[in-house]
Amino acid sequence: MGSIRPFNVKRTAEELADKFPNVFGDKFEENKKKLEKMMPDVSKRTINMIAGYITRYAVKKKEKAKREIEENSLN
């Protein structure tokens, strides 16, 4: 069972993902490196938590868009 992320991690991750949609994607390592450059003074653990949530958030958005396209094509 996974752990629950703090609200500030979720909020920060969602804000960054929405603000920079072309920067972040569904690859954790790439997201982590980009975050390390954007926020050099944040701890490694926090960077990993934010990068993990951004990755998950990006995958969910991609799946949701795919589902909507499929639903629209059926109608």
UniProtKB/Swiss-Prot annotation:
* GO biological process: one example: translation
Cellular component, GO, one term: ribosome
What is the recorded name of this protein? Answer: Small ribosomal subunit protein eS17
Q: Gene symbol?
A: rps17e
Q: Name any one GO molecular function.
A: structural constituent of ribosome
- Enumerate the NCBIfam families for this protein: PRK01151.1
Recorded hits in InterPro entries, A to Z, give: Ribosomal_eS17, Ribosomal_eS17_CS, Ribosomal_eS17_sf
Identify the species of origin. Thermoplasma acidophilum (strain ATCC 25905 / DSM 1728 / JCM 9062 / NBRC 15155 / AMRC-C165)
Instruction: Give UniProt keywords alphabetically.
Output: Ribonucleoprotein, Ribosomal protein
| Family affiliation | Belongs to the eukaryotic ribosomal protein eS17 family.
Q: Which residues form the signal peptide?
A: none
Pfam families under this entry? Answer: Ribosomal_S17e
